[in-house]
A protein has these predicted regions:
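Secretory/organelle targeting and membrane-embedding segments
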Residues: 1-28, 32-290
Length: 290
């Protein structure tokens, strides 16, 4: 992989080698810089060589089968669209948990990036955009992009006090994962022993628009966690708890889970009567959709 700081020079070398012809296409992926200013600078350097219609800024998470299925789930099935709003959804969780630490010398890159830059500002915000966007006018890349941008622009901003209330950053410590002893983040190869870079980040976001006003979106990502999974879960609000309020299990709510990896699929958690001759308690069951 080429560091994004070299994108501009690489583009000039391509041009000087005579390889930039009208049918040429440039494919780039994150990280594009380390902040807004460096991202603008890199994009400007690329634009000196390539036209916008030659440039493809990609996110490989969007190539995952279940991620591609989100728009179909939402907009091709009338059972979901009426419920897909703050009136019925209590909160949304987007989780990416990884077993891996800094294997393969990845510490040199990761210690300069961290969990937020490495995963949240690209992969997880892409998933959030697919969950929260309005229906595009068509399935063209520009139309889908425009609706995603609307979502990102309506994410509520945070000042220092809001960050303290809504964001957590952490590092993993020495411990065991399965039967293997693993070092702390600061003891990993090619990581600064005094590093303040986060290997775990969690945040609560709000989208200030008509559909999602008041519904929190919880995003979390971490390394060296006991479970390896990337998934989205939409927790629906519970119905008025009148009929079954005295029964065990009645406080559970319906949850739609979209599993991105490793086991792709979708399921709905639903309540039902526990088998038996009397109505003693309720139990949760998973209805697989995909």
């Amino acid at each position: 992989a080429i560091a994004s700081s070299l994108f501009g020079d690489s583009c000039r070398f391509i041009r000087d080698s005579g390889l930039n012809v009208p049918q040429s296409r440039l494919v780039i992926e994150k990280p594009i810089g380390k902040d807004k200013l460096t991202a603008i600078e890199i994009n400007n350097k690329i634009a000196e060589v390539f036209k916008e219609n030659q440039i493809y800024r990609i996110d490989h998470y969007l190539g995952k089968e279940t991620a591609q299925n989100i728009m179909v789930l939402r907009f091709a099935n009338s059972i979901f669209e009426p419920l897909w709003r703050s009136r019925f959804i209590d909160h949304v969780q987007i989780t990416c948990a990884e077993h891996l630490g800094m294997e393969g010398g990845r510490g040199a890159y990761y210690d300069k990036a961290g969990a937020a830059r490495d995963m949240v500002q690209n992969h997880l915000l892409q998933l959030l955009s697919l969950i929260a966007m309005e229906p595009p006018t068509d399935l063209s890349a520009n139309s889908v992009r425009d609706e995603k941008v609307k979502v990102l622009r309506t994410i509520r901003g945070m000042g220092p006090e809001e960050v303290r209330k809504n964001v957590i950053r952490a590092q993993y410590t020495e411990g065991t994962l399965g039967s293997k002893t693993v070092p702390s983040y600061r003891d990993e190869d090619r990581v600064d022993p005094k590093s303040m870079t986060e290997s775990y980040v969690a945040m609560r976001l709000f989208i200030d628009n008509w559909r999602w006003e008041g519904t929190p979106f919880y995003i979390r990502m971490g390394k060296r966690l006991p479970t390896k999974a990337t998934e989205i879960s939409l927790h629906l609000k519970s119905p008025p708890n009148v009929l079954f309020q005295k029964l065990p299990g009645s406080t559970e709510s319906n949850v739609l889970t979209i599993r991105i990896q490793p086991d792709e699929g979708m399921s709905v958690r639903m309540l039902s009567k526990k088998p038996g001759t009397t109505l003693q308690n309720l139990c949760c069951g998973e209805l697989s959709l995909l």
